[in-house]
């Protein structure tokens, strides 16, 4: 199997829960593991899930337009991380902000953690049956791991990508930025849809 998934979802009144495990490359990894509390147009999510940064990263695997997210997206965004996020949504607006560690449940590190503060805003000035204008802006401020003093990768950000296929998961592109104090990234989204 390239990627075998098994998971469970549960809901009770205003609460939701999701746990999903993945098996790929002879390794088992926890994918999603979170609880959500929703009230009216707001929700709070805590656990391990995608940071609200790139639309290509946070959409479901079933909704991907190609076999894999673009290589640039894989290199410049993070996978799932442990954290907490607040979301507010209406028909025309979506706002999400969160605080995340640099750990995921499948790769717990014995180190001083970096952290990230994320935010995403979406505005849909036109949102009808056959017409849509979607404008989005997202930002992340991240600090690197304060790893143990004897580690060579202290205060380093790594950008890497396996390319456009998960069949061969070897890293094709990698760049390390060392002696980093923090990083700040901005992402934009624009979608215009019109159907006669």
Predicted segments — roles?
Residues 113-196:
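Surface-exposed beta-loop-beta
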Residues 1-105, 109-144:
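Outer membrane beta-barrel
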